[in-house]
Amino acid sequence: MRRAELAGLKTMAWVPAESAVEELMPRLLPVEPCDLTEGFDPSVPPRTPQEYLRRVQIEAAQCPDVVVAQIDPKKLKRKQSVNISLSGCQPAPEGYSPTLQWQQQQVAQFSTVRQNVNKHRSHWKSQQLDSNVTMPKSEDEEGWKKFCLGEKLCADGAVGPATNESPGIDYVQIGFPPLLSIVSRMNQATVTSVLEYLSNWFGERDFTPELGRWLYALLACLEKPLLPEAHSLIRQLARRCSEVRLLVDSKDDERVPALNLLICLVSRYFDQRDLADEPS
């Protein structure tokens, strides 16, 4: 498309598509029209440079001007974009923040746990699971929520006292604990996915011991350096912990040290220092 000015008015003059393409993509190797013999057959290998160049011209002319990729939306991974917020955690209420010594001790202990998990992963992965343990597929969000937290908690959405209605333990109802024989079978994609599922659940509900155990175990299995998705998730987790901590009435509440621990691990072990609690 060329611009022309006539009598002070700007008009747009269209040129043929071939000329427009030529202006946008000039020929690097200008080729004059080839005077080939009548016996030229573009379907056979070229015998001369002229035949080769002519064959390239023919193939280029057969290419469509616009190509549309056929994309199957079902194959696209959900939530491809990653939005990383740089906002920090909510400051701890007075008396709720842990000491620096306590935080350093938790980081050291967590590092030891991670080393042991990696060291014995092959052993625990080879152990046979109990007959009642069926791990959901990686993409089954509802299945993993029920597996980790229990069908009762996921259905009610509220935290209540545990009841012993039967002599045995019904893990389907109360959730399976993060046993080494279970978490050792989870690859990094599954670890990240389950961390996302539980973080989403936590974003709308209160903190529970079952949730805390699984979050700790998943962080222990999370490999460094962090992928962007995992980086965003753990920051989101730490911020949510700080928000829930603000709602706790007493510093003696059993949720406070658990929330402090998760904030500590995200900020000090995974190097998100802007989220760290100021030592008390």
Swiss-Prot record:
Effect of R213D: Impairs binding to SMN1
Cellular localisation: Nucleus, Gem; Cytoplasm
GO biological process: mRNA processing; negative regulation of RNA binding; RNA splicing; RNA splicing, via transesterification reactions; spliceosomal complex assembly; spliceosomal snRNP assembly
UniProt entry keywords in alphabetical sequence: Cytoplasm, mRNA processing, mRNA splicing, Nucleus, Phosphoprotein
Keyword flag Transmembrane: no
Family: Belongs to the gemin-2 family.
Record function comment: The SMN complex catalyzes the assembly of small nuclear ribonucleoproteins (snRNPs), the building blocks of the spliceosome, and thereby plays an important role in the splicing of cellular pre-mRNAs. Most spliceosomal snRNPs contain a common set of Sm proteins SNRPB, SNRPD1, SNRPD2, SNRPD3, SNRPE, SNRPF and SNRPG that assemble in a heptameric protein ring on the Sm site of the small nuclear RNA to form the core snRNP (Sm core).
Protein's name in the database: Gem-associated protein 2
Organism of origin: Homo sapiens (Human)
Taxonomic lineage: Eukaryota, Metazoa, Chordata, Craniata, Vertebrata
Underlying gene: GEMIN2
